Amino acid sequence: MSELLSVALFLASVLIYAWKAGRNTWWFAATLTVLGLFVILNITLYASDYFTGDGINDAVLYTLTNSLTGAGVGKYILPGIGIALALVAVFGALGWVLRRRRHHPHHVGYSLLALLLALGSVDASPAFRQITELVKSQMRDGDPDFAVYYKEPAKTIPHPKLNLVYIYGESLERTYFDNDAFPNLTPELGALKNEGLDFSHTMQLPGTDYTIAGMVASQCGIPLFAPFEGNASASVSSFFPQNICLGDILKNSGYQNYFVQGANLRFAGKDVFLKSHGFDHLYGAEELKTVVADPSYRNDWGFYDDTVLDEAWKKFEALSRSGQRFSLFTLTVDTHHPDGFISRTCNRKRYDYDGKPNQSFSTVSCSQENIAEFINKIKASPWFKDTVIVVSSDHLAMNNTAWKYLNKQDRNNLFFILRGDKPQQETLAVKRNTMDNGATVLDILGGDNFIGLGRSSLSGQSLSEVFLNVKEKVLAMKPDIIRLWNFPKEIKDFTVDRDKNMIAFSGSHFRLPLLLRVSDKRVEPLPESEYSAPLRFQLADFAPRDNFVWIDRCYKMAQLWAPALALSTDWCVSQGQLGGQQTVQHVDKAQWQGKTAFKDTMIDMERYKGNVDTLKIVDNDIRYKADSFIFNVAGAPEEVKQFSGISRPESWGRWSNAQLGDEVKIEYKAPLPKKFDLVITAKAFGDNANRPIPVRVGNEEQTLVLGHDVSTITLHFNNPTDANTLVIAPPAPVSTNEGNILGHSPRKLGIGMVEIKVVNVES
């Protein structure tokens, strides 16, 4: 209703101004601005829905002030371009329509009416309401009901008897199991769901709507609200350190807690969260690659579900045989948006909807088959009688190729339980949410029936039942939940641990790199993560007077304030204000002690603009003074005009990447010498090793042979044609996720370059 009203008010404003208001520059500008705001808000809502499937939420609010560089972002480039073009077109058309009768005499009354209608359209729009509620949630001091409903459980289970297997299905919401809407999509896992305790109304609340947030909610009974963006949690050293979560209780009760997934454990800080709360045995992409049958069988995120669940079964079997009390948590990944991945061992590789194949539905059908096979192995084992199996989605599906069909249904998260000790078959329609999952499991295991804000759905009352406006209530509690981090409010002295890549201050520890915004009563950490912009881009968003402390590799800040460190990959500390004074200090000790020293200086807006512009220079456009191309830092020597076919800097150098260009091309500003030596320090990847690699300058070609280890080779070139471009053509680029950013499409690697130097040998 609100949406229709806002559109009606918008159209009425346009029509009244265009046909009745007449010509007046001020009224035209004011009306166009407000109507344009309406358009921007609704395009923002549409774009946010595309990424999150949940409108404008906390993640979007963060992204509005930070660049999105995360997993699979390349698949969203075309929609993003489309939205930008649509915005330009709509603004142009809107301006043209409003000025249709610009020669008509100006009428103040109609102009005022049009402006008021435009303001009303903005106020009535769902986008404005969502943003307003989010902004309010940032400004609130908390909610008195938090202290009433937040409860800490006992730290142990009195007489534990059952082992626990907890399966998180990535985005595997209960909606997929509606056989009327999606016939025969989930037959195997759906049949198992119908054998157990099936909770049919598990809603999604703010702060529980992405993987790490869903895990925190289900184990700690609280949403993931933090003094930083949730997926940046990898930078913290402890996770809700004061909370008692399900893993803590299990460990205190004698359980050995295991977690197995196919992706890297560091992503979004899952390793930090789990280690902080009772898990001593963690297996992710790095840990599994030495034990799985086929280490090369991977998707963009890590190992496929069939591989992960095979390893989980091996763990279950070994732990059961040992007689040790245990919990085994596992997380799938094949159903990750936007398209998902299909394991090669499943039979259900294709699912058609509306008469054509649908990739997201296909991955769901495949993944549920893999999960069901894993569960059936447990059920067929002699240890099932001592086991509780839990299957839940981590969150609702985000925008994927099935999303528009899901949205036509009543959407809920998946949560069902299979008890080997006491089979129960029942569908419970009680209103609940993800925070109730851990408390329900704890209740079954013999512990308390509450964790945090979560309540057992078997013997307690969920906040979803208590409050009709539970989403607004949870947002109101956001400041209370953030306070649970016990995060410091000031920084004076700090220590940088060069060997552990950590910074410590006021009792808190963070992984490096890190950017801090410092005010009188608040220290805001801005870590670097897969979903956030590089820290220099985040710093560029600071106001001229904002105090900052920036700990990063020296070369990243050297181009601004310390040219002598332009090639250093050591840690440096910079602090100051972008519009005032800045300092850069080299971390030259294993335990480096620092102090904050913000000077109250005059703000120079020219300096501020220059700093911001320099911070925003993209990596490939950075230039430094050097007599060679050093590949483990961003940019290139001043003599280089441009380059292509080269991946991002890593700690050792850079790979060639045929996804960015079939050949490595380095174009210099001036012709290369008539006669020169080309000194190349590099290594080869995969089948490129021990094969001739063509290297060309003008009409002359030499060959380079590299092994898998780094070596230095000198090639001799004559350049009679004054060519200025060096070309290296790896013969067999290999598509791989080796060293890739989590969730990104595979790179096609050829050679790994450490340094290239041109030595003039003209006599």
From Swiss-Prot:
Keywords: Cell inner membrane, Cell membrane, Membrane, Transferase, Transmembrane, Transmembrane helix. GO terms for cellular component: plasma membrane. It is a multi-pass membrane protein. Its main location: membrane. It catalyses: a phosphatidylglycerol + a membrane-derived-oligosaccharide D-glucose = a 1,2-diacyl-sn-glycerol + a membrane-derived-oligosaccharide 6-(glycerophospho)-D-glucose. Belongs to the OpgB family. This is Phosphoglycerol transferase I.
